């Protein structure tokens, strides 16, 4: 940050309703975002297309003071304000072209959130103020959104918040568990804790609740070495879902890649410190923290989405636009837009975010949602893309766990087995083969043997080990283990899409009756099938992943897409620990068997050589 003592007073005073202008120094173009150093705060924001950028300080009454950022280096607009301390709410206004046919959507009537914001406050109201087009006109013709109505979004949007970066990590150290010794447990912060009787009510659904000894003891009883958290970056609830009385429960709708989602904090004013405290608690028990991250798209959606940060900052830099009509967005993700990982600044944002979560928040790895999108240099998935090059060379990110969801919805997006050497992958072929085998598909026997022994056909040729295969049979997306053996068809009516959402081909078998039954033979068969699948998962070569609640037969009543169900349908029902105590005990035994016997977690593939008998030695 700047140490230049010559104070520069801004000329811009905005609407004049805020307090007197603070002292402003030139500051630095690095680091990006708002950085408090103990004496003041440096602000830095990127926009290549901007003609002017204003820093907007918001007081407790919602009044705004605008300060022109007159210093620009490498398209980064910056200033240092010695009077600004943690807790200060702020945003930016970007003046520049609003020309959608050219790919530009600057709108200074929008208070923009900091792309590097470490914390956020407030709510979105999804009124006209959030949108840079006439919503009534767009309802008539969605392709022609016209000129922006210039309705000020202050008071209708969230604000960024300056944080205190200092934290007592004590003697915290990363566990650094080797892959071949790792057992991953995929969990949802709220779903894991919302009904846990051992977690104090005021901590349920929070980072503090997840770090409660009652939860950690459960994980340790399962011999779990890493908890993989579904998205905890700050995300938005979709307007459509809110209108249906639903919510974006899963959280794959990020707009803040540096901020822990504040609705998971018991104290929203201290979300960063609470997240760090959670990580420290897990590390004390030898459990790694892996984040499910969504760097493939943002919450702003397509051309009809709100303008909350990236779109108004520099639309063409942050997003992939259609080559033949720059008004519209390429959509490899099924969400309305795709981040432009070809642009150097967007790549910088992704890498800066990853490094921040490792160095400042002490997380131990990442699972990349729809990772194939990050590898699309043009249209095809390219394992030599700039993103993979940067990860390979980065001295911090290359040393943590990197897990790819190796597909997206674009053409050629299914890339299981094709990621570079540092990466592990959610092995979708393992999932499909194990499901088919246990529902009685005889043709799968040969492939089942390959999956059981580490999927060498997918990973050995690229120099990877069996642990590159993240083995799973169920995950957040799809049936739970209980539902996999209880339903032939999805039952997603509660999602408000007439059961048209979610995967139709589930490779499931209901054992004779659709849904719940009192038939003792079917109940016994289902219990045996669940044990078969858990045993297969834990005794296969590779790195196993358990989906939260499967160890006690959690059900979603046949709903295989609970992305919008923030309710008892998706939360863990901890009473099942008693009801299904036999399955829980079995899971604990088989995970311990894996942990105790290295033969189930070999570091190398089987060589395929005949076993010599004693007479041949």
What annotation goes with each model-predicted range?
Residues 92, 576-607:
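Aromatic- and carboxylate-lined catalytic core of secreted/periplasmic carbohydrate-active enzymes
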């Amino acid at each position: 940050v700047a140490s230049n003592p010559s104070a520069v007073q801004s000329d811009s005073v905005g609407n004049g309703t805020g307090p007197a202008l603070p002292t402003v120094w030139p500051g630095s173009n690095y680091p990006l975002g708002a950085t408090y150093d103990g004496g003041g705060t440096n602000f830095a924001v990127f926009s290549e297309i901007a003609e002017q950028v204003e820093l907007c300080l918001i007081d407790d009454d919602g009044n705004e003071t605008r300060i022109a950022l007159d210093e620009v280096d490498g398209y980064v607009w910056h200033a240092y304000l010695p009077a600004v301390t943690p807790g200060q709410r702020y945003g930016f206004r970007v003046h520049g072209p609003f020309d959608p046919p050219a790919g530009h959507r600057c709108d200074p009537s929008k208070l923009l959130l900091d792309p590097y914001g470490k914390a956020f406050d407030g709510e979105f109201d999804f009124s006209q103020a959030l949108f840079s087009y006439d919503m009534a006109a767009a309802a008539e013709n969605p392709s022609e959104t016209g000129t922006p109505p210039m309705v000020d979004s202050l008071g209708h949007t969230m604000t960024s918040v300056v944080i205190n970066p200092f934290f007592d990590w004590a003697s915290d150290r990363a566990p650094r568990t080797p892959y071949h010794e790792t057992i991953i447990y995929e969990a949802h912060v709220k779903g894991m804790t919302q009904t846990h009787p051992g977690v104090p009510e005021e901590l349920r659904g929070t980072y503090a609740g997840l770090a409660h000894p009652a939860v950690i003891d459960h994980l340790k009883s399962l011999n779990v070495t890493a908890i993989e958290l579904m998205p905890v970056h700050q995300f938005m609830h979709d307007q459509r879902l809110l209108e249906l009385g639903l919510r974006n429960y899963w959280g794959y709708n990020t707009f803040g890649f540096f901020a822990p989602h504040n609705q998971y904090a018991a104290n929203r004013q201290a979300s960063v410190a609470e997240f760090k405290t959670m990580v420290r608690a897990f590390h004390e028990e030898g459990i790694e923290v892996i984040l499910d991250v969504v760097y493939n798209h943002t919450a702003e959606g397509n051309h009809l989405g709100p303008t909350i940060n990236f779109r108004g900052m520099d639309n063409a830099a942050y997003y992939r636009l259609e080559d033949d009509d720059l008004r519209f967005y390429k959509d490899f993700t099924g969400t309305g837009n795709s981040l432009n990982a070809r642009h150097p600044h967007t790549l910088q944002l992704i890498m800066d975010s990853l490094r921040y979560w490792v160095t400042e928040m002490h997380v131990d790895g990442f699972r990349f949602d729809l990772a194939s999108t990050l590898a699309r240099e043009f249209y095809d998935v390219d394992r030599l893309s700039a993103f993979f090059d940067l990860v390979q060379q980065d001295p911090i990110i290359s040393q943590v766990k990197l897990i790819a969801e190796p597909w997206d919805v674009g053409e050629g997006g299914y890339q299981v087995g094709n990621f570079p050497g540092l990466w592990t992958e959610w092995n979708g072929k393992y999932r499909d083969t194990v499901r088919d085998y246990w529902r009685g598909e005889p043709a799968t026997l040969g492939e089942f043997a390959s999956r059981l022994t580490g999927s060498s056909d997918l990973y050995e040729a690229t120099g990877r080990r069996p642990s590159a295969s993240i083995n799973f049979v169920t995950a957040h997306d799809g049936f739970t283990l209980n539902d996999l053996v209880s339903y032939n068809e999805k039952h997603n009516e509660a999602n408000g899409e007439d059961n048209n959402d979610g995967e139709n081909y589930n490779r499931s078998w209901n054992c004779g009756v659709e849904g719940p039954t009192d038939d003792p033979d079917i109940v016994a068969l289902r219990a045996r099938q669940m044990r078969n699948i858990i045993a297969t998962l834990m005794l296969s070569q590779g790195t196993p992943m358990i989906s939260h609640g499967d160890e006690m037969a959690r059900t979603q009543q046949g709903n295989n897409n609970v992305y919008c169900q923030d309710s008892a349908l998706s939360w863990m029902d901890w009473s099942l620990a008693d009801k299904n105590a036999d399955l829980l005990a079995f899971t604990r035994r088989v995970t311990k068997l894996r942990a105790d016997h290295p033969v189930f977690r070999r570091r190398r593939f089987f060589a395929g050589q005949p076993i010599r008998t004693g007479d041949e030695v």
